[in-house]
């Protein structure tokens, strides 16, 4: 039986802040935990058996925002807990990247601090600069492309997705398959975004995808802004923020969003009679990945490293794949024939046949400024 504990309320999380550190990087830490705190790999710490033994002695994994119904985190946490007999404290009262960084900073030396962080890549980069993350290399990290891991070993891309087009197949006679298609007058009042591109990652990356579909590049997002100005002027783009519920009611029958979210929405509203399909735009798209990292001040340093090993193992990556995300090691697992083919087959073929481009940190920062300066003027 798994030992999964969800901390669901802010009050509980706040109360946890008062707990003194029994296992943190301060006094009272066991010799084995102290050894693993400085270990940069399984080999450096004495091998996998030694890591498992030390982790089981610590007994608990503290994480935040790993919502059970997102990316199959529920299945991943259960499998880890059952395999190693480790209790999971999963604080789901909050969970944004910034929330996790704040928790790490505010809970220094406390039992309640996080062992593991699951953040946007830009947050991992910033956290590395602030020396909040431990250097630790999972055994399978060599399978990751160089642009999907930090040079100093503080973070690794474990899951991600591709911008796609979701469409209510019953409400729309012919679903669009490209950004160009979305400009067709027959889609007037039908197309929606998940939110304001100037304040949200999803919207920002959707504009990036539109730029690549219209002659832009990862260094030039302006064609994407111009595209959405045209889509808005045509009346095709509506101001509603799309969620699964607005698809179900028919308010937003066509939605641009991450493929893994669209696929999850389809599952959630299928029993409502909605046939929601997901297509990767044929004329251009982008991908984006989350970063997995270990808190340098983790109260359970051996557990944190064992969890990192599990996330990047074949088992862990396949469990994430069941949640419709693209595991970081997907290409290597396909080559090694260790991928779950049934789960892989549920992803759009175009999302897995060829990796979509992903902007680097410098490109993100420069183009976010372009978007912030020009979106409201162009689209309103």
Model-derived segments and their meaning:
Residues 160-164, 225-230, 236, 271-296:
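Periplasmic-binding protein-like
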Residues 286, 290, 294-355:
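Mature extracytoplasmic/periplasmic domains
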Residues 123-126, 248, 254-274:
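A ligand-binding cleft/hinge motif common to bilobed small-molecule-binding domains
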Residues 336-380:
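Extracellular/periplasmic bilobal clamshell ligand-binding domains
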Residues 62-77, 89-105, 111-251:
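Extracytoplasmic ligand-binding site segments that recognize negatively charged/polar headgroups
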Residues 46-56, 66-87:
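Short, polar/charged alpha-helical segment
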Residues 1-21:
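Sec-dependent bacterial lipoprotein signal peptides
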Residues 20-34:
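Bacterial lipoprotein signal-peptidase II cleavage site
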């Amino acid at each position: 039986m798994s030992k999964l504990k969800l901390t669901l309320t802010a009050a509980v999380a706040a109360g946890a802040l008062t707990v003194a550190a029994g296992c943190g990087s301060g006094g009272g830490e066991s010799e084995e935990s102290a050894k693993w705190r400085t270990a940069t790999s399984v080999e450096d710490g004495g091998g996998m058996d030694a890591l498992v033994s030390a982790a089981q002695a610590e007994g608990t994994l503290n994480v935040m925002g790993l919502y059970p119904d997102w990316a199959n985190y529920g299945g991943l946490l259960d499998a880890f807990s059952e395999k190693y007999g480790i209790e999971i404290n999963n604080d789901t009262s909050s969970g944004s990247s910034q929330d996790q960084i704040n928790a790490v900073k505010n809970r220094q030396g406390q039992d309640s601090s996080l062992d593991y962080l699951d953040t946007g890549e830009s947050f991992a980069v910033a956290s590395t600069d602030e020396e909040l993350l431990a250097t630790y290399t999972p055994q399978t990290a060599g399978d990751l492309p160089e642009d999907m891991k930090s040079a100093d070993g503080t973070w690794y891309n474990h899951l991600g997705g591709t911008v796609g087009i979701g469409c209510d197949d019953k409400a729309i006679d012919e679903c669009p398959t490209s950004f160009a298609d979305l400009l067709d007058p027959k889609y007037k009042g039908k197309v929606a975004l998940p939110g304001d591109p100037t304040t949200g990652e999803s919207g920002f990356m959707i504009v990036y995808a539109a730029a690549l579909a219209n002659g832009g590049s990862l260094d030039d997002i302006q064609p994407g802004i111009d595209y959405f100005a045209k889509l808005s002027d045509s009346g095709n783009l509506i101001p509603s923020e799309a969620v699964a519920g607005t698809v179900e009611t028919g308010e937003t029958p066509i939605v641009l969003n991450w493929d893994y979210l669209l696929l999850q929405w389809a599952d959630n509203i299928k029993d409502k009679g909605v046939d929601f399909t997901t297509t990767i735009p044929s004329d251009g798209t982008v991908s984006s990945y989350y970063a997995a990292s270990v808190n340098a001040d983790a109260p359970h340093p051996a557990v944190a490293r064992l969890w990192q090993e599990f996330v990047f193992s074949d088992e862990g990556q396949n469990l994430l794949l069941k949640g419709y995300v693209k595991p970081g090691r997907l290409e290597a697992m396909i080559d090694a024939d260790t991928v779950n083919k049934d789960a892989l087959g549920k992803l759009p073929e175009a999302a897995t046949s060829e990796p979509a481009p992903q902007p680097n940190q410098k490109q993100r920062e420069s183009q976010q400024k372009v978007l912030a300066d020009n979106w409201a003027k162009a689209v309103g």
